Amino acid sequence: MELPGAKKTKTGYSTAADVLENLAADVPFVADILEYRQLAKLKSTYADGLAHCIEADGRIRSSFQQTVTATGRISSTEPNLQNIPIRMELGKLIRKVFHPKEGYVFVDADYSQIELRVLSHMSGDENLIQAFLQGQDIHRSTASLVFHTPFDEVTELQRRNAKAVNFGIVYGISAFGLSRDLGIGKKEAQKYIDDYFLAYPKMKTFLDGLVEEGKEQGKVTTMYGRIRPIPELSSSNFMQRQFGERIAMNSPIQGTAADIIKIAMVRVHDRLQKEGLESRLLLQVHDELLIETKTEELEQVKALLAEEMQKAADLSVPLEVDMHTGNTWYDAK
């Protein structure tokens, strides 16, 4: 068909997702192929896969491990209930099949931007700390500083780009990676990163310090002392060393956030038990707790969730919790 943007491989034209996505806007049936693939994946992995895990009482029980991930996050297997899609609407609909028992509702409590809050605390950067203390939209605040624009005049595009930089910095993103994510040139992406570090001057010092710590000690640690060995930093392979630097920057932040959510889980569980409530903690998905809540206990559970999650760590910025209630997991998210 000689489609524009088509990519050829040794065996013929590529049908990889990224290639098809570039063609979809100009060729309608390509969009249909992508949608079909998405639906087939959802059916085989989630609809059919989860159906095989339903037990006699109608519940699905997963196994949770504390020692599998290098960052300290809890992982879920058989089945994995932490990877139910959230970024695509069709995938999110899978959550509609999860509902509480009669007389109960779901309460979903999710830490808001916890890794950025941990980063602000650990780096001690006053500009980032003040933005959180003042309750500002952190992405709009970053856009204002990076693009030298008054806070109230920041455009949605500027905010979206600043959001990508905010979260990218946590993962040690490169100019190449940011340029690919935002669809901009590498030079422009590097300027975004440079301006970010000018806006938050202590951030670069902190992140560079983590890399140096990793190189000198062969490891980095979380705020609570969790150790992450980084043998990649002493590799003879340049790409491996770069990967190691990203690990050094991210692990103390992501690992500290993982430690905090575990502390919150213990606090919430103990409080539910102490107050003799019938509501119970069902699931943890990284920064999110799902509680099967007795209807009569709803307000009490919401209050204790907010209190215990916010008090789980004493940071220089507040821990904020977004909370939603629903008759299905989908409605509560």
Walk through the language-model features, giving the residues of each.
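Conserved short beta-strand edge segments in small beta-sheet-based binding/regulatory domains
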Residues: 314-324
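A structural signal for short secondary-structure junctions
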Residues: 99-102, 274-277, 282-286, 313-316
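Conserved catalytic core of nucleic-acid polymerases
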Residues: 25, 61-62, 66-69, 144-277, ...
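A common structural junction motif
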Residues: 200-201, 307-315
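Short active-site loop/helix that positions an aromatic residue
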Residues: 113-124
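Hydrophobic (often cysteine-bearing) scaffold residues that line and stabilize catalytic clefts
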Residues: 115, 135, 139, 257, ...
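Conserved "right-hand" nucleotidyltransferase catalytic core of DNA-directed polymerases
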Residues: 1-89, 99, 105, 112-115, ...
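Short, polar/flexible loop-turn hinges at active-site or ligand-entry regions and domain interfaces
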Residues: 126-132, 150-154
